[in-house]
Amino acid sequence: MRWSAYWTRALARRLIRRLLAGDGGDRLQPRWLPRRWVTVVSGDIDPDAGVAVLWVVSRPGHESAVSYSMAFERCGEEWTSTGGGSSSSDAAAVRRRLPVGSTGQLGMIELGGGGGCPSRAHLLQHPDDWMSAPWVGSNTLQVAAEVDHLVVGERRIEVPANGTLVVAWKAPPSTVRGGVRPRIAAIGADGTELAVLGPRDQMDSHTWARVLGD
């Protein structure tokens, strides 16, 4: 409970400020915060859409390690939590990045878990208008070593050294439960588009090509 309160009220707010200042990717870990206590796995923010997501692991490498994720939306001047989760795993903190096609990294972009909810900012202004509320969502991704960065919708997102990250997004109102995730493209160091994960895809285009080729 103590950690949960600190995570939501103090650390998360500091990390959001760092994201707003442009300190994403591997720069998101505060220098004053030892990784052996808390490892900041990933964070993402879309200031224009007013959405953010954070992922940290407490006590990585220890039997009591816990992974925490939490999504946020800007409501007025405040960043408000829209939900999150935890699990007894530190895999994201200790994972090393793997080349595509290897055991544990079949595709350029591996889609992990995700979640979301109707926009709270919209519902604060229009409490009875659920049908017109945008969807605020997030997803975890595992990216191959060949990928330099991602393009999520129109945004460029840096990939952390271990290739594991979270992305935040906001989608227009939709009849599809859970909203429609934006297009995600994996880009190589030379600017080549290596693979695409479409809005409704569970596998990226590189993986599909290998499956159909076999």
Predicted regions and their residues:
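Short, surface-exposed beta-strand/strand-loop-strand elements in extracellular ectodomains
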Residues: H149-E154
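Serine/threonine-biased, Pro/acidic-interspersed low-complexity stretches characteristic
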Residues: M1-Q142, T175-D214
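Glycine-centered loop-to-beta-strand initiation motif
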Residues: R156-S174, G191
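Short proline/glycine-enriched turn/loop motifs at strand-loop junctions of beta-rich domains
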Residues: Q142-D148
